[in-house]
């Protein structure tokens, strides 16, 4: 059915159930399908040539528009909060307020840097960001079959949209909900628009998605792509779900997180920098039989 599922990076706890879901989504047809995806480290690569690839926040943090002092403070925040974000021994309840604190402090620091709206394209061009191998096929196929793609990101929307734009895949079927910058009349960043989206509130509490999902109420088959426990709630705004396939990229601390990911995601991709498996499943689902 889907030869890509034989890749060595693939782990599936319940293969029969997963194949059943994939078959059911195919039977429902592409008019019933929508894709809901995280962006950073899901559509973009986690690592390349042994180095970490940047997230949409990192792209700003590391860019020429941030002062040395600003860079140091942002790095300090990362070193303090990132271990908390991925700590398997803390509950989501413990993590949530700390993530709000991190994002708020980072956005306040960025807002002091006088970032110009016109600089963002250049900042993205100069960065090391890479989309996962196979991104062209993913975006092209979804566009060709008019399958809506909802990108739900705790990153920076302005940066993320620019990455997709520069990759020439920002098609009309792609919708983004993320943290967007608010510029003053002269195009200088003054703050970020609310609501704040962090790793662990990607759910109904962020209301921008709900109107979107209402319009797509007939699309009851969902493929969800994520890389964190916080991404599992991204489809919570969908009014009725008949079939959902959750695919998780396990990028970091693979050994210690494997058990939790296998329990939470239908398919887990370990240290896999490609979209091969996603594309293989879509090829099977979208193939006219």
UniProtKB/Swiss-Prot annotation:
It catalyses: N(7)-methyl-GMP + H2O = N(7)-methylguanosine + phosphate; CMP + H2O = cytidine + phosphate; a ribonucleoside 5'-phosphate + H2O = a ribonucleoside + phosphate. It is an enzyme of class 3 (hydrolase). One of its GO terms (cellular component) is cytoplasm. Mg(2+) binds at residues 38, 40, 227. CMP binds at residue 85. It holds the Pfam family UMPH-1. This is 7-methylguanosine phosphate-specific 5'-nucleotidase.
